[in-house]
Amino acid sequence: MARISGVDLPREKRIEIGLTYVYGIGRVRASKILEEAGVNPDTRVKDLTDEEVAKIAKVIDADPEHLVEGDLRREVAMNIKRLKEIGCYRGIRHRKGLPCRGQKTKTNARTCKGPKKTVANKKK
């Protein structure tokens, strides 16, 4: 089983799709990585040689601009923490668990707010 950046890639999938299982790598970036490494994108993960896996890992680690897995998760968490600390609008919305990109919250936003909290009716 190929292991890249601490992630086990699914054996039966094409390497181009398998690379997208790494946090921070999408379809476009996966194809660019394979092009740089000189690996055929149609190769199945189980058919990769150790040399090809090493080439792919080297290409991923060589680019300091594009973070993957733990480093990227840490940077995103630090950005959110900074927003909360400075007390800006987005930070306050993050703190309250509400959407911070301008969506309406009167009816929707259930993903952020969680399940409905029903209020009992008063009897007359």
Curated annotation (Swiss-Prot):
Care to name a GO molecular-function term for this sequence? tRNA binding
- Keywords attached to this entry: Ribonucleoprotein, Ribosomal protein, RNA-binding, rRNA-binding, tRNA-binding
Q: Which domain of life is it from?
A: Bacteria
Checking InterPro entries in the record gives: Rbsml_uS13_C, Ribosomal_uS13, Ribosomal_uS13-like_H2TH, Ribosomal_uS13_bac-type, Ribosomal_uS13_CS
Composition bias, kind Basic residues: at what positions? 113-124
Q: What's one GO-annotated cellular component?
A: cytosol
Q: Which residue positions does the secretion signal occupy?
A: none
Which terms does the UniProt entry file under GO BP?
translation
Q: Does the keyword tRNA-binding apply?
A: yes
Q: Positions of the region Disordered? A: 99-124
What is the protein's known function?
Located at the top of the head of the 30S subunit, it contacts several helices of the 16S rRNA. In the 70S ribosome it contacts the 23S rRNA (bridge B1a) and protein L5 of the 50S subunit (bridge B1b), connecting the 2 subunits; these bridges are implicated in subunit movement. Contacts the tRNAs in the A and P-sites.
User: What do we know about how this protein assembles, alone or with others?
Assistant: Part of the 30S ribosomal subunit. Forms a loose heterodimer with protein S19. Forms two bridges to the 50S subunit in the 70S ribosome.
Name of the protein in its database record: Small ribosomal subunit protein uS13
Which taxonomic lineage does the organism of this UniProt entry have? Bacteria, Bacillati, Bacillota, Clostridia, Lachnospirales
